[in-house]
UniProtKB/Swiss-Prot annotation:
Record lipid sites (N-palmitoyl cysteine): C22
Lipidation sites (S-diacylglycerol cysteine): C22
Gene it is expressed from: lprG
Organism whose genome encodes this protein: Mycolicibacterium hassiacum (strain DSM 44199 / CIP 105218 / JCM 12690 / 3849) (Mycobacterium hassiacum)
GO biological process, one term: lipid transport
InterPro entries from the UniProt entry: LolA/LolB/LppX, LppX/LprAFG
Membrane topology: Lipid-anchor
This protein's name: Lipoarabinomannan carrier protein LprG
Gene Ontology MF term list: lipid binding
Length: 232
């Protein structure tokens, strides 16, 4: 009987030791993350040199200043700013889903309420998509203006292994990429940066106020984008 108890006790202690070993290993993995400031700088440099991207933008919460619920499309700033895709927006108090849009020569064309695509007006009156890739106003500038940045985890986003970084983004950087938000203070920010290669930006999220987020998920960096301007 004593031998059996000894065997059970030994098995129990072995299991405890193994669990302790696993916990220690997980802790060491969690602390073995790249330096946040260095990774942000590397990603900012990469982003600053990019001229096209596939973008998925989503918002949560009440955001009257930016009436975009979601937007997905291709964007380029070479040779000029142009974009094409679909968006869900609130227009005149009515939610319009999956509305086709084109941005060309500074103008926004869209198919409102199922109509044929037509000229709406200056794109910047709704949202200046050209700001996203602008080296001084866009995503690169957002990455360069993180403070209190910390690498907190490794996560897979769009099948890309990323390092998740949290911190604050300066009000100036937020207002440059989205002037409609008109924030007064630094806001919560999270960036998911590719763990390898040129450390491309995979996703970024801004929290202009409690319960409100703007998330951009990015892919196909550098892929050629051709946008045809609709007939007037």
């Amino acid at each position: 009987m004593q031998t059996r108890l000894t065997a059970i006790l030994a098995a129990f202690l072995t299991a405890v030791a193994l669990l302790a070993g696993c916990s220690k290993s997980e802790e060491s993995t969690a602390t073995d993350l790249p330096d946040a400031a260095t990774l942000l700088q590397q990603s900012a440099e990469t982003t600053r040199g990019e001229s096209s991207v596939h973008l998925l933008l989503r918002t949560t919460g009440e955001l009257e200043e930016l009436p975009i619920h979601s937007l997905e499309g291709d964007l380029t700033n070479t040779p000029a700013v142009a974009a094409e895709g679909k968006t869900t927006v609130t227009v005149m108090g009515q939610k319009v889903e999956d509305m086709p849009f084109v941005v060309a020569d500074g103008d926004l064309y869209a198919a409102l309420f199922g109509d044929a695509i037509s000229l709406i007006g200056p794109a910047a009156d709704i949202y200046d998509v050209g700001a996203i890739l602008d080296p001084e106003r866009g995503l690169a500038n957002v990455l360069s203006n993180f403070s209190d940045a910390k690498s907190v985890d490794r996560e897979k986003v769009n099948d890309v292994e990323t390092v998740k970084i949290t911190g604050k983004v300066s009000a100036d950087a937020v207002n440059r990429i989205a002037p409609q938000l008109a924030v007064q203070d630094a806001v919560g920010g999270t960036a998911w940066i590719a763990d390898g290669g040129d450390h491309e930006l995979v996703q970024v999220q801004l929290e202009p106020r409690d319960g409100v987020t703007v998330t951009m998920t990015l892919s196909d960096w550098g892929k050629p984008v051709t946008v045809t301007k609709p007939a007037a």
